[in-house]
Amino acid sequence: MRRALDGPGSSSLDTRQADKRQVRFRQCYFNPISCFRK
């Protein structure tokens, strides 16, 4: 990802978004019913 080179805060923001996406993916994987209900 080249966006991390744009600035000092962009990389942390990208990682934060990736973490959120990973958490959501994990919830969907282990509990698909609650994931699709939203």
From Swiss-Prot:
Q: Where in the cell is it found?
A: Secreted
Which residues are removed as the propeptide when the protein matures?
A: 1-19
Q: Look up keyword Secreted and say if it applies.
A: yes
Its main subcellular localisation, reduced to a broad class, is: secreted
Q: Would you tell me the Gene Ontology cellular component terms?
A: extracellular region
List-wise, which residues carry Pyrrolidone carboxylic acid?
Q22
Q: Does the keyword Transcription regulation apply?
A: no
- Keywords for the protein's UniProt record, in alphabetical order: Cleavage on pair of basic residues, Neuropeptide, Pyrrolidone carboxylic acid, Secreted
List membrane-spanning regions.
none
**Expression sites (tissue/organ):** In its non-pyroglutamate form, expressed in antennal lobe (AL), corpora cardiaca (CC), corpora allata (CA) and gnathal ganglion (GNG) with expression in AL detected in most animals and expression in CC, CA and GNG detected in few animals (at protein level). In its pyroglutamate form, expressed in antennal lobe (AL), corpora cardiaca (CC) and corpora allata (CA) with expression detected in few animals (at protein level). Not expressed in GNG (protein level).
Task: List, in alphabetical order, the GO biological process terms annotated in this UniProt record.
Answer: neuropeptide signaling pathway
- Record family assignment: Belongs to the allatostatin family.
What this chain does, per the entry, is described as: Strongly inhibits juvenile hormone biosynthesis.
Q: Spell out the protein name for this chain.
A: Allatostatin-C
Q: Give the species.
A: Agrotis ipsilon (Black cutworm moth)
Taxonomic lineage is: Eukaryota, Metazoa, Ecdysozoa, Arthropoda, Hexapoda
